[in-house]
């Protein structure tokens, strides 16, 4: 419950932040800051030590393990800050924009702050207790939103985006120690233990970060800040519904898989159950978001942002389909198959970056989006192959387990598009809102109706429908007991 509430509130705050900042800033502002945040993501990915996963997987971490994790994170944060300070001027010169210098210095400082976070919070995650995570996530997002909106409304400057990031990290550190008092000590014990687990996982993180971030640097250099601003905004909005609806589930999945990793049959059953539930929830949300993208953009962002509609439509649908194999990451980590995850990410990097580079040079932003669709589907297939290797569940079995969700989402999208074609042209915000609400309601009814009809026709097999009915029954029972008491 706490994780669901946390993600719902964080999701709402993220959307609110995006909308409000889009009112005060221009696409070029988002593109400029996206260059800095992308370089930051690549550097942090290249130095990622996966200490959280190592502490979760450890049988019985002691104080010395937490102190070692804090020491490593602090050293890493300081190194990244120094690297960004040294690279700030050359990067600004390369992209021909001196404003990047200050942006990179501020972003580097934010990473140094993040390295100071309390590693003891992992204790709650290991025990699947998420109340504290709720307060941490909501507080940091709220402070970041407040800081960025104040700067944007006052100065209409790209610094609003940067200040929000720094404020978020500062709040993250302060609240982490308020929730779980802890006095860190510098120690160099257990470094070998951490590196033995995280070596391949860190390499995988490097490849994965380059894989999914390098295109932003290419677009910024080849196409400029304004197209990059559209691309960055579209990409961020497209991934938002899928990511936020599945985050509460995904946060509990890795610890759960790690706890049963020595029982192959239980692990395979748990994976199939979790994957079907994730897809049943995320697929209709992502596909539905793609269908309503045009009216949503006009309503909340304004017509200046209309070029992001195609980006959202294409990428939101791809992100939704990718959830079919998205749990391969926690599955592979739980089984210690981090080397295989690294190989996967390197294969995708070698395929993806050259194609996107050529597409950007020859066909512009639309060419990049088409390549994203193709490589997204390819990565989904590779993930399904890896799942088969890890736990023996065939690709056909994985797809069959998601048949109802796939068919229901396809019919939902078709139905909403067909019915929407009869809507009159909206002439104002109120009409646009009414049509958007109608699309959402129609989509929800179609998806649920088709899904549960198929489930009934298939003799009610065990699946996400069973899980959802059980959850609704528990909620109904609790409400009934409260009313009667």
Positions of predicted regions on the chain:
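Interhelical loop/hinge segments that connect adjacent transmembrane helices in multipass membrane
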Residues: 131, 136, 174-216, 222, ...
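Helix-terminus/linker motif at the lipid-water interface of multi-pass membrane proteins
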Residues: 15-29, 92-94, 150, 211-240, ...
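Membrane-interface junctions at transmembrane-helix termini in multi-pass inner-membrane proteins
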Residues: 54-63, 113-138, 159, 180, ...
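Signature of the first transmembrane helix
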Residues: 1-49, 76-90, 105, 110, ...
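Membrane-proximal transmembrane or re-entrant/amphipathic helices at the cytosolic face
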Residues: 388-395, 417-485
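Alpha-helical transmembrane segments of multi-pass membrane transport and lipid-handling proteins
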Residues: 8, 15, 71-96, 102-106, ...
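Specific pore-lining/lateral-gate transmembrane helices of multi-pass inner-membrane transport
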Residues: 57-72, 230-346
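Hydrophobic alpha-helical transmembrane segments
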Residues: 101-108, 136-181, 193-198, 230-238, ...
């Amino acid at each position: 419950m706490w994780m669901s509430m946390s993600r719902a509130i964080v999701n709402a705050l993220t959307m609110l932040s995006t909308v409000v900042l889009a009112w005060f800033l221009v696409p070029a502002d988002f593109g400029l800051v996206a260059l800095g945040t992308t370089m930051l993501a690549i550097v942090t990915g290249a130095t990622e030590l996966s200490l959280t996963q190592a502490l979760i997987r450890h049988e019985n971490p002691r104080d010395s393990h937490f102190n070692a994790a804090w020491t490593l994170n602090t050293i890493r944060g300081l190194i990244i800050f120094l690297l960004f300070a040294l690279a700030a001027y050359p990067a600004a010169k390369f992209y021909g924009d001196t404003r990047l210098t200050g942006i990179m210095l501020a972003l580097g400082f934010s990473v140094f702050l993040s390295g100071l976070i309390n590693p003891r919070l992992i204790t709650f995650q290991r025990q699947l207790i998420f109340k504290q995570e709720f307060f941490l996530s909501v507080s940091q997002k709220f402070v970041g939103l407040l800081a960025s909106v104040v700067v944007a409304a006052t100065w209409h400057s790209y610094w609003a985006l940067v200040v929000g990031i720094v404020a978020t990290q500062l709040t993250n550190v302060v609240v982490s120690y308020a929730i779980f008092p802890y006095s860190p000590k510098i120690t160099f014990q257990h470094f070998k233990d951490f590196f033995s687990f995280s070596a391949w996982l860190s390499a995988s993180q490097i490849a994965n970060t380059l894989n999914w971030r390098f295109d932003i640097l290419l677009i910024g250099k080849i196409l400029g800040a304004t197209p990059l601003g559209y691309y960055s905004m579209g990409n961020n909005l497209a991934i938002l519904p899928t990511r936020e609806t599945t985050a509460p589930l995904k946060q509990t999945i890795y610890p759960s898989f790690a706890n049963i990793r020595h029982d192959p049959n239980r692990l395979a059953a748990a994976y199939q159950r979790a994957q079907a539930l994730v897809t049943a929830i995320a697929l209709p949300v992502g596909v539905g978001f793609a269908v309503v993208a045009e009216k949503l953009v006009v309503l909340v962002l304004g017509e200046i942002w209309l070029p992001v509609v195609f980006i959202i439509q294409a990428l939101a649908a791809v992100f939704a389909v990718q959830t079919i194999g998205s749990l391969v990451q926690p599955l592979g980590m739980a089984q210690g198959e981090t080397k295989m995850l690294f190989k996967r990410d390197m294969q995708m990097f070698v395929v993806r970056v050259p194609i996107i580079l050529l597409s950007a040079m020859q066909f512009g932003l639309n060419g990049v989006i088409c390549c994203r669709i193709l490589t997204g589907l390819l990565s989904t297939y590779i993930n399904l192959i890896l799942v088969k290797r890890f736990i023996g569940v065939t690709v056909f079995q994985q797809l069959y387990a998601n048949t109802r969700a796939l068919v229901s989402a396809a019919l939902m999208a078709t139905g909403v598009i067909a019915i929407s074609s009869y809507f009159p042209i909206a002439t104002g915000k109120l009409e646009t809102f009414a049509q958007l609400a109608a699309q959402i309601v129609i989509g929800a009814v179609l998806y649920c109706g088709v899904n549960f009809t198929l489930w009934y026709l298939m003799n009610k097999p065990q699946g996400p429908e069973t899980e959802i009915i059980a959850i609704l029954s528990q909620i109904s029972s609790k409400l009934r007991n409260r009313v009667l008491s």
